[in-house]
Design a protein with these regions (language model features):
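Pre-active-site segment of Zn-dependent metallo-hydrolases
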Residues: 18-58, 70-74, 123, 149-162
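Active-site-proximal loop/helix segments of hydrolase catalytic cores
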Residues: 120-186
Length: 236
């Protein structure tokens, strides 16, 4: 069961899992101060990178412009027209519209994806359609939480009774005590992959050193930090 995870920038990742290649929040072109985005130069590098070839599914947790670019997504679908598109707002005539509390998708015979509507971090974003996902293949489960509010009871309900083998979470889940407690006591993953960090040149607020300092405080058997663009991590 081969699984590798490769980031683009910001929250974007590509999961290469057996014959499947899933992109989550990979394509975006709006920079938020203190974070990074997929500039035209980085976008061209991504299109040429081995980890970002022939995606099967383009999944976007939500449609904020630092997570989703319609222009880049259309270019990718022109390049790989077989890629499915799944996101929680109607953006294209042909897409998988994530709606309702939960939504299930199966890819091939061996990959199951359970999507769950989760609250976005921050009260002003409470109405934003936002979905996390649990992916399962050969009994191995991967949690993608997106920009879920830290400690959200909806996320606790989503993972209740589930053995999470890998959790992919933004860095505040490690830097904030509330986030660490939720990871250790509720999600309880066997492995933790921390992402959504800015590149060094964009780190206006010291997110990178704060996250590095906090890694040793989270009690998870294996922890990885995704802090470079196109940094491949072999999970299993």
């Amino acid at each position: 069961m081969a699984l590798s995870v490769t980031p683009s920038v910001n929250a974007g990742i590509s999961l290469h899992w057996g014959e499947h290649r899933i992109w989550c929040d990979v394509l975006h072109n709006r920079q938020v101060p203190g974070l990074s985005t997929l500039t035209p130069e980085r976008f061209q590098s991504l299109l040429a990178h081995p980890a970002f070839q022939d995606p099967e599914l383009l999944f976007f947790t939500h449609c904020h412009p630092d997570h989703y670019s319609k222009t880049q997504t259309r270019l990718v679908q022109q390049h790989w027209p077989g890629a499915f598109l799944a996101l929680p707002e109607r953006q294209e005539a042909v897409q998988i519209l994530l709606q309702g509390e939960q939504f299930h998708l199966r890819l091939g015979e061996d990959l199951s994806i359970q999507f769950r509507r989760l609250p976005h971090e921050g009260k002003r974003y409470a109405a934003v359609p936002h979905y996390g996902a649990l992916l399962e293949r050969e009994g191995f489960r991967v949690l993608l939480a997106g920009d879920c509010a830290i400690g959200a009871p909806e996320l606790a309900d989503f993972v209740a009774g589930t053995a999470v083998d890998l959790a992919v979470l933004p860095f505040p889940w490690v830097t904030l005590p509330k986030g660490r407690a939720f990871v250790e006591e509720v999600i309880r993953p066997r492995r933790l992959l921390v992402h959504h960090l800015p590149l060094p040149e964009d780190d206006l607020y010291g997110y990178r050193p704060a996250t590095e300092a906090a890694l040793s405080k989270v009690q998870v058997p294996e922890v990885w930090l995704m802090d470079r663009a196109f940094q491949e991590i072999i999970v299993a």
